[in-house]
Amino acid sequence: MKISCFLLLVLSLSCFQINSVSGIDSVKCFQKNNTCHTIRCPYFQDEVGTCYEGRGKCCQKRLLSIRVPKKKV
């Protein structure tokens, strides 16, 4: 009885993972040094693709262009 309960526990934990990274889109996102988020990308990041087999968003750091005024010589 204990063995069957243990096997059922292992089976249920392996089948019902929330954030499985086995999706090919997740692997591509991580290879490009981006991050995966399940809800939406933070303010300072742009959405560039999907993760977790289409259930999440692949986010890339936003390039900020800040102009620095030149000193007058």
Curated annotation (Swiss-Prot):
GO BP terms in the entry: defense response to Gram-negative bacterium; defense response to Gram-positive bacterium; innate immune response in mucosa
Source organism of the structure: Rattus norvegicus
Top-rank taxon, per record: Eukaryota
Keyword NADP: no
Name of the protein: Beta-defensin 39
Taxonomic placement: Eukaryota, Metazoa, Chordata, Craniata, Vertebrata
Membrane spanning residue stretches: none
Keyword Coiled coil: no
Gene Ontology MF term list: CCR6 chemokine receptor binding
Keywords: Antibiotic, Antimicrobial, Defensin, Disulfide bond, Secreted, Signal
Family, similarity comment: Belongs to the beta-defensin family.
Signal peptide: 1-23
